Design a protein with these regions (language model features):
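Cysteine endopeptidase catalytic domains of the caspase/legumain-like
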Residues: 1-302
Length: 302
């Protein structure tokens, strides 16, 4: 009997040992599963962060290519040789330089210099016909400009300016150009106007009642940039012996516009800052002005 009791106790002890071993194994398995679940949770959070970053980049890229659906086309004019108001020194070269830079950036260029009234209106009409829906459009004008009754006009080389009505007939309305681009369905229009915003007729004693270019309002999908603030002179040169052949605004613009992956907002912040400093260095004031209704980003060199 005693022998049988000993055997039974041994069996029960082995049973307890097996149960404890199994429990320990189950605990280890549970801990491993818990660790795996925690690792999976962290991996899920990491993947979610990556997905959010990818979605943010996609959204940014979509904004950057908002205006990339169409072609890139530019209308560039530089008028130096005015017949009845003061001649300019650098407008023609400014237009040529900007035209070359835009060509390098992938734009189809329509470049014109020293246009009289007839030629300027014909060139504008031809350019309007080229613009297609979704195009990125850049309009660059270097020359004289004036405003009458709050309306901005870009002046051809043979402008007379004997009276306001004559200027309205002979000059080109800036707003008309912008309206034409909108009518043609341009995806984005950037107007760069490197013109004095004082009165070019003042020294000639003409009583036209006009003053420098007026503040304006861009419509959706357009950005308008004046090289100088209202009533300011856009400097051709910093001083008579200035060795740089381009006007102050254009020389800075040329340096900034071809920096890769630089948005127009960043370009213009840099341009404005440097133009202000350059003008200040010779005791002048010139502050580029921007009127912006663009949607998304524009890059000269994406």
């Amino acid at each position: 009997m005693e022998r049988l009791k000993d055997q039974l106790n041994q069996v029960n002890a082995q049973k307890n040992d097996i149960t404890q071993g199994e429990l320990a194994q189950l605990r280890r398995q549970a801990e491993q599963k818990e660790q795996a679940a925690e690792a999976a949770k962290k991996e899920m959070e990491r993947l979610k962060d990556q997905l959010n970053q990818v979605n943010a980049q996609i959204k940014k890229d979509e904004n950057q290519i908002t205006y990339r659906a169409g072609r890139r086309i530019a209308f560039v004019v530089g008028n130096n040789h005015y017949q009845n108001v003061s001649r300019l020194e650098t407008a023609k070269l400014d237009a040529i330089s900007v035209g070359n830079a835009l060509k390098e950036a992938g734009f189809k260029i329509n470049l014109h210099t020293d246009l009289n009234e007839k030629s300027m209106k014909l060139a504008m009409r031809d350019f309007k016909a080229q613009v297609q829906k979704g195009d990125e459009v850049v309009v660059f004008f270097a020359g004289h400009g004036v405003q009458i009754g709050g309306v901005n006009y870009l002046l051809p080389t043979d402008i007379q300016g004997d009276n306001e009505e004559q200027i309205r007939d002979e000059a080109i309305q800036l707003q008309r150009i912008l309206d034409d681009m909108q009518d043609r369905g341009a995806g984005f229009t950037l107007a760069l106007i490197d013109a004095c915003r004082d009165n070019p007729f003042r020294q000639q004693g003409r009583s036209i009642g006009g003053r420098g270019l007026a503040p304006t309002t861009a419509t959706t999908g357009q950005m308008i940039i004046f090289s100088a603030g209202s009533g300011q002179q856009a400097l051709d040169k910093l001083y008579p012996t200035d060795p740089v052949p381009n006007g102050v605004f254009t020389r800075v613009l040329l340096r900034e516009m071809l920096k890769p992956k630089t948005s127009i907002d960043r370009v213009m912040r840099n341009v404005r800052q440097d133009v202000v400093q350059l003008a200040k260095s010779v005791g002048k004031e010139q502050t580029p002005a921007l009127y912006d209704q663009a949607v998304g980003d524009f890059y000269f060199k994406p």
